Every structure is written in structure tokens, then in C-alpha cells.
């Protein structure tokens, strides 16, 4: 057996984990600024939750979920996305009785069996936002503004928000009827999957990635042309709020998103380079989802950001920050007494917020210095019997190799003055 990670998964090594910590920190910061609180939930759920929540006709449910029977014979699925799980959490823990709206965010791994290309993985990571309890277009604008400003905070300056409205269940009936009639005229040219979608949910055809289906869909009826007065008013108000917030957006009448729970507002955020768009965020409103999976009627809206794709984009654009210096100090020891003292000194330095490691392998001083250099430490503190007797240590600046003799009790302040 070859020892390696399964196809479609990826290890995050120390030389890149700081990038993940950086974007996670930025996301937590923006969530805090907008008043959102973190939730955490299981990696797996009962399969029925995703069948009812995500939609039986979606590619996710039909083709991509990791589903198995547990030892009790229950059908379990590794979460393919976060919204359905947060909706279940909302119902199970009685969030409907809490002050509305409820603003929640999460950072998760998710799982889908799909082609591994262009920043896509079978285990991937998402940042997500869910807002429950408000139908107002103000909430839609806030959600979009949050995601937009998150990307701006990372230095992305070519991002555009593509927005659309797919209407409510009332006005969507006429749209779906006309859409079905349109695609029936091209039935023989549709891919096998879209032929099945035609009866169950013809809107899914608009989301098909097959070239022929994409070509046919270009002239299909647009959901925005069938909006009822209430949905039109909602969408116009959203555009006004986005204008007021200074968010760069355009209307894309063919965005429908790949999940069945969406209503009214749907959006994608893309990075534009040489007229090519890379989607880095997607979301929308889902006013019927909570009721659909067994809760009381509660409007909601949210989005998800693909972390792997985001990091890939930041790397391509040179927006990755410099790796922080960890550890800052290496304590080299000569002898058992020095090693014991090194523990004491290391504890003091760490208490002062200075990242410190000590020698553990009883190597020669030369080997220890080579190790400190490979770690990229700023300083090496050298302690031997002679230094212990005098209550001092040698502090070597690794970049210049210059050394100073410093009293041990003043070491922390000395190093802090140099950092």
C-alpha cells in the first residue's frame, strides 16, 4: 500500500498553515464587526436532512454525497455544505424563540465526490454566514456587503458581485412553466441528466456545466422577467442598498445557484482577470428552508466561501502575508545543568510572549546553531556551565552572528527590545 492521502484531499503543512490562520482570522474579524456569532456542528448528519434541504434533484444529492449506513442501519451523510446543518441546528435548539434576526457564522470542512481540478477537492473548506428571521432587502445587502468587504480586506480589488432574483414560489410557477416549454423544444440536444431535470426541476438545467446545455440555456427565459410586484420591489430595494454601500455589482439574469432551497435573491462573487471570472463566493435567500425541513416558517439568507480557491487566488495575486517568525528564540545548552536552566528560561520567555524552543537532542553547539538557523530563529541563547556560574547567557543574533553577554534575569526584556 502506498502511504498517501486519498484523492481529492490535501494536507496543510506548517509552511502554509499560517495562510489558513490568516484568512480565518480575517473572516472572524469581519463577522465580529457585523455582529455574527460562531456555531459548530457535526461533520455528518442524517441523509434525509440533505435530501429535504438541499434538494433531491440537485447534483449534490444525486451524484456527490458521501453516504453510508452506520452500524445501527441509519443512513448517514458527510456534510456536503453548511446551510442545511445550520438550519437543523436552528430548529433543534429553539433559535426561533431568540431575538431576531439571528446572525451565525461557521468555518467547516465539507465533502463532495466531484472532479478534482481548479482548486476543487473532495474534502474542502468553507467560511459560511447564515442570517435567520428577516425578509428585508436590507439583510440581503448586509450579507453581500459583509462578503464583499471581507475580500477587500484581503487586498482583492477586482471583485464583482453578480446578483439575480429567482422570485418566490408564487411568481416562479409561470416562469418554470415557460422554461420547461422552452427546453422541450431542445429536448433531443439536452444531456441525459438535464432530460431528467426537465420534469422534476427545469431550473437546474440553467446550472448545467455541459457545453451544449450551456449554449441552449443562453436564450432561455429569465427568472427576473417573471417576478411578481413584491419580488420586483424587493430586488430594486436591494440594488439601492448596494449602491449606497458602495458595492460593485451587476445583474446576471441566469444565476440560479445549485441548491433547491433558494428564493428571491441569489448572488455570486467573482474575481475578474482579463475578462475571466473565478467564482469565490455564492449564496442567496432561502425563506422556505426552515419550514421545509420541519421548523416553523422563518426567512433566511446566507453564503459560503471556498477557502482552498480563495487561498489559491491570493497566492496567484501575491497577497499572501510573510510567514511570521516562529520560533523567535532557540536556547542552546551545554550540559545537564544548563538544560534544566533552559526550561526555566524558556518558561519566562514564553510568559512574556516570546516564542521559544530548547535543545532536546544533546547535540554539539555547532549542530545546535545549524538547527537554529534552519528554524529561522531571530536569536540563539547559549547557556553552559561557565554562564550558569555567572548568572549570564550569550545572546547571538542569527542574521549577523553578533553576540552579547546578558544577565539571565534581564534576558526577556533584552530580546523584546530587539524584536
UniProtKB/Swiss-Prot annotation:
Family in the record: Belongs to the class-II aminoacyl-tRNA synthetase family.
Oligomeric form and interacting partners: Homodimer.
Pfam families per the UniProt record, alphabetical: HGTP_anticodon, tRNA-synt_His
Gene3D superfamilies, per database record: Anticodon-binding domain (3.40.50.800), Bira Bifunctional Protein, Domain 2 (3.30.930.10)
Domain of life the protein comes from: Bacteria
PANTHER family: HISTIDINE--TRNA LIGASE, MITOCHONDRIAL-RELATED, HISTIDYL-TRNA SYNTHETASE
GO BP annotations listed: histidyl-tRNA aminoacylation
SUPFAM superfamilies (alphabetical): Class II aaRS ABD-related (SSF52954), Class II aaRS and biotin synthetases (SSF55681)
Keywords carried by this UniProt record: Aminoacyl-tRNA synthetase, ATP-binding, Cytoplasm, Ligase, Nucleotide-binding, Protein biosynthesis
CDD domains linked to this entry: HisRS-like_core, HisRS_anticodon
Substrates-to-products reaction catalysed: tRNA(His) + L-histidine + ATP = L-histidyl-tRNA(His) + AMP + diphosphate + H(+)
Chain coiled-coil ranges: none
Source organism of this protein record: Caldicellulosiruptor saccharolyticus (strain ATCC 43494 / DSM 8903 / Tp8T 6331)
Keyword Nucleotide-binding listed: yes
GO molecular function terms attached to this record: ATP binding; catalytic activity, acting on a protein; histidine-tRNA ligase activity; transferase activity
Location within or outside the cell: Cytoplasm
GO CC terms in record: cytoplasm
InterPro entries: aa-tRNA-synth_II, aa-tRNA-synth_II/BPL/LPL, Anticodon-bd, Anticodon-bd_dom_sf, His-tRNA-ligase, HisRS-like_core, HisRS/HisZ, HisRS_anticodon
Enzyme Commission code: 6.1.1.21
Protein name: Histidine--tRNA ligase
Amino acid at each position: 500500500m502506498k502511504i498517501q492521502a486519498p484523492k481529492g484531499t490535501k494536507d496543510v503543512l506548517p509552511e502554509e498553515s499560517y495562510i489558513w490562520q490568516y484568512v480565518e482570522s480575517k473572516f472572524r474579524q469581519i463577522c465580529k464587526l457585523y455582529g455574527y456569532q460562531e456555531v459548530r456542528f457535526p461533520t455528518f448528519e442524517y441523509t434525509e436532512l440533505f435530501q429535504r434541504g438541499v434538494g433531491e434533484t440537485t447534483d449534490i444529492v444525486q451524484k456527490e454525497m458521501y453516504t453510508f449506513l452506520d452500524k445501527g442501519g441509519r443512513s448517514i451523510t458527510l456534510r456536503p455544505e453548511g446551510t442545511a446543518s445550520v438550519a437543523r441546528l436552528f430548529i433543534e435548539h429553539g433559535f426561533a424563540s431568540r431575538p431576531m434576526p439571528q446572525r451565525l457564522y461557521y468555518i467547516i470542512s465539507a465533502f463532495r465526490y466531484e472532479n478534482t481540478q481548479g482548486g476543487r477537492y473532495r474534502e474542502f473548506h468553507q467560511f459560511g454566514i447564515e442570517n435567520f428571521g428577516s425578509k428585508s432587502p436590507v439583510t440581503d445587502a448586509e450579507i453581500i456587503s459583509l462578503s464583499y468587504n471581507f475580500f477587500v480586506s484581503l487586498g482583492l480589488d477586482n471583485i464583482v458581485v453578480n446578483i439575480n432574483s429567482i422570485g418566490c414560489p408564487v411568481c416562479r410557477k409561470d416562469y418554470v412553466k415557460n422554461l420547461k416549454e422552452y427546453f422541450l423544444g431542445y429536448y433531443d440536444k439536452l444531456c441525459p441528466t438535464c432530460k431528467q431535470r426537465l420534469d422534476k426541476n427545469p431550473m437546474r438545467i440553467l446550472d448545467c456545466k455541459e457545453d451544449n446545455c450551456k449554449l441552449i440555456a443562453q436564450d432561455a427565459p429569465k427568472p427576473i422577467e417573471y417576478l411578481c410586484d413584491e419580488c420586483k420591489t424587493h430586488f430594486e430595494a436591494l440594488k439601492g442598498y448596494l449602491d449606497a454601500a458602495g458595492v460593485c455589482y451587476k445583474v446576471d439574469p441566469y444565476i440560479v445557484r445549485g441548491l433547491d432551497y433558494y428564493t428571491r435573491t441569489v448572488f455570486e462573487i467573482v474575481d475578474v482577470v482579463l475578462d475571466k471570472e473565478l467564482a469565490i463566493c455564492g449564496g442567496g435567500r432561502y425563506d422556505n428552508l426552515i419550514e421545509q425541513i420541519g421548523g416553523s416558517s422563518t426567512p433566511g439568507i446566507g453564503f459560503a466561501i471556498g477557502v482552498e480557491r480563495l487561498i489559491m487566488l491570493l497566492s496567484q495575486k501575491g497577497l499572501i502575508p510573510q510567514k511570521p517568525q516562529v520560533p523567535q528564540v532557540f536556547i542552546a545548552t551545554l550540559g545537564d545543568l544548563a538544560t534544566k536552566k533552559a526550561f526555566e528560561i524558556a518558561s519566562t520567555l514564553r510568559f512574556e510572549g516570546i516564542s521559544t524552543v530548547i535543545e532536546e537532542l544533546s547535540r554539539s553547539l555547532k549542530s545546535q546553531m545549524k538547527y537554529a538557523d534552519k528554524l529561522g530563529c531571530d536569536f540563539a541563547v547559549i547557556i553552559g556551565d561557565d554562564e550558569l556560574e555567572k548568572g549570564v547567557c550569550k545572546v547571538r543574533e542569527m542574521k549577523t552572528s553578533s553576540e552579547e553577554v546578558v544577565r539571565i534575569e534581564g534576558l526577556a526584556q533584552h530580546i523584546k527590545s530587539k524584536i
